[in-house]
Amino acid sequence: RAILGAEGNRVQGLIAPGHVCTVMGYREYEELSAEYGIPIVVAGFEPLDLLAATLMLARQLEQGRARLENQYSRSVTRDGNPAARRLMDEVFETADRKWRGIGRLPLSGLRMRASYDEQNAEVRFETAVEPVDEPAECISAMVLRGRAKPTDCPAFGGRCTPSNPMGAPMVSTEGACAAYYHFRRSESGGES
């Protein structure tokens, strides 16, 4: 909601993460689709899953439709995995969290309940995770919000690579910057 409701939002559709929806279901995504009038497709992570989800999303956009579709029905149901949800509810509670490129959002993350303090590394080892700011030239916050492409970044592919990442989207192999880096094509049409 922080991204979809932001001024200047350009997100036209979402591919929802199948691994999350396998546990949590997709009810919340149905609500987002209706609230913001955008198509959302739940997808698995195999290449054919992603291609099929992209096609489903494109068809909805072309037809002016906005609803949730479940491409990953072999694993995801509307209600997810009730046993896993009960276990998560037993161990975790919602908490305010800071999100890269967005800031602190109330009740947007999870923390272990006090009854699990004995297993909670933050409590047991009295750790304090200090926030690390990205370098000023890193535009990962804009990439994460869908306001810029990885290739718009002056550090992309030079000072910022998967082996020397400057921001979160280059760290993870699932990140937009890392994906662009690994699958980019040169201007002449060949691999770079």
For the regions a protein language model found, what residue spans apply to each?
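Glycine-rich, charged/polar anion/phosphate-binding loops
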Residues: 1-2, 26-29, 123, 139
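Short intrinsically disordered, low-complexity coil segments enriched in acidic
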Residues: 1-4, 188
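Solvent-exposed alpha-helices and their adjacent loops that cap or buttress functional pockets
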Residues: 3-13, 31-35, 130, 145-146, ...
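A conserved active-site cap/scaffold subdomain adjacent to cofactor or substrate pockets
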Residues: 9-77
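Short conserved micro-motifs at the rims of enzyme active sites and ligand-binding pockets
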Residues: 54, 164-166, 189
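Catalytic phosphate/nucleotide-handling subdomain of diverse soluble enzymes
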Residues: 186-192
